[in-house]
Amino acid sequence: MNDQRKGDHAEPTTHFGYQDVPESQKAKKVAEVFHSVAAKYDLMNDVLSGGMHRLWKRFTIELSGVRSGNRVLDIAGGTGDLAAKFSRLVGPTGQVVLADINDSMLKVGRDRLLDRGVAGNIEFVQADAEKLPFPDNHFDCVTIAFGLRNVTHKDEAIRSMLRVLKPGGRLLILEFSKPTNKLMSRAYDAYSFAFMPLAGKLITNDAESYRYLAESIRMHPDQETLKSMMVEAGFDRVTYHNMTSGIVAVHRGIKP
């Protein structure tokens, strides 16, 4: 556990990047980051990943097994990359719910998908991953891409995702993870703490938000730890696939 107590009555703390902050403040601080970067979020994704994020998301969709008529929940769906693709897969008899806790990101996603004409079977919901406002056993598939590391209580969020899935439903977590070799790890550290804040400054005039994002990646559970968290929450057949030498991993679990 990342939480620390400084006294019997002190508020628990958690990490915000490399800082320890009161739990009640983390969501506010994360919200400020995404309010700041929402307008140019897609551009920054392309710049920072060299377009690789599109391949990572495509592989996640292939693993999802989503088909016509399914009901899909995309948590931290932001600007709608996954939701747009799921919309086409589920077709007119299916439904996609794009959920995000951040209203700025949700607005960008809604506007973008409406402009593209692909929002007919997509519902937009402002929601907290830890307390999903949906019925039990409701979705065939739940996804969260590059969002779990920003959640304060990750274990609660994973249990919430389990609750809203139908038996046999799939959870897919796409997230930055731990590189699998030392050379890649050193290169990735240099890239993250030098280039990412610089690009953030040049493109969004916000170096600090991208410094936080780099730090948040380092504080996120590694591949095996996240797998164990999913098993502990109640998922079966939990597996993960490393991509780009473990810089990114996608975890998949099935609700019994």
UniProtKB/Swiss-Prot annotation:
Q: Which UniProt keywords apply?
A: Menaquinone biosynthesis, Methyltransferase, S-adenosyl-L-methionine, Transferase, Ubiquinone biosynthesis
Classify the source by domain of life.
Answer: Bacteria
Which SUPFAM superfamilies does the entry mention?
A: S-adenosyl-L-methionine-dependent methyltransferases (SSF53335)
Enzyme class (EC, first level): transferase
Single GO BP term: methylation
Quote the PROSITE patterns the UniProt record gives: SAM_MT_UBIE, UBIE_1, UBIE_2
Q: Where is the composition biased (Basic and acidic residues)?
A: 1-12
- Report if keyword Secreted is assigned: no
Record Pfam families: Ubie_methyltran
In short, the EC number is 2.1.1.163, 2.1.1.201
User: Which pathway does the record list?
Assistant: Quinol/quinone metabolism; menaquinone biosynthesis; menaquinol from 1,4-dihydroxy-2-naphthoate: step 2/2; Cofactor biosynthesis; ubiquinone biosynthesis
Chain spans, region Disordered:
1-23
Q: Which GO terms describe its molecular function?
A: 2-methoxy-6-polyprenyl-1,4-benzoquinol methyltransferase activity; demethylmenaquinone methyltransferase activity
Amino acids binding S-adenosyl-L-methionine: 79, 100, 128-129
Q: Kindly state which reaction or reactions the protein catalyses.
A: a 2-demethylmenaquinol + S-adenosyl-L-methionine = a menaquinol + S-adenosyl-L-homocysteine + H(+); a 2-methoxy-6-(all-trans-polyprenyl)benzene-1,4-diol + S-adenosyl-L-methionine = a 5-methoxy-2-methyl-3-(all-trans-polyprenyl)benzene-1,4-diol + S-adenosyl-L-homocysteine + H(+)
Write down the HAMAP family for this protein, in alphabetical order. Answer: MenG_UbiE_methyltr
PANTHER family reported for this sequence:
2-METHOXY-6-POLYPRENYL-1,4-BENZOQUINOL METHYLASE, MITOCHONDRIAL (PTHR43591:SF24), METHYLTRANSFERASE (PTHR43591)
Similarity remark: Belongs to the class I-like SAM-binding methyltransferase superfamily. MenG/UbiE family.
Described purpose of this protein according to its UniProt entry: Methyltransferase required for the conversion of demethylmenaquinol (DMKH2) to menaquinol (MKH2) and the conversion of 2-polyprenyl-6-methoxy-1,4-benzoquinol (DDMQH2) to 2-polyprenyl-3-methyl-6-methoxy-1,4-benzoquinol (DMQH2).
Q: Know the name of this protein?
A: Ubiquinone/menaquinone biosynthesis C-methyltransferase UbiE
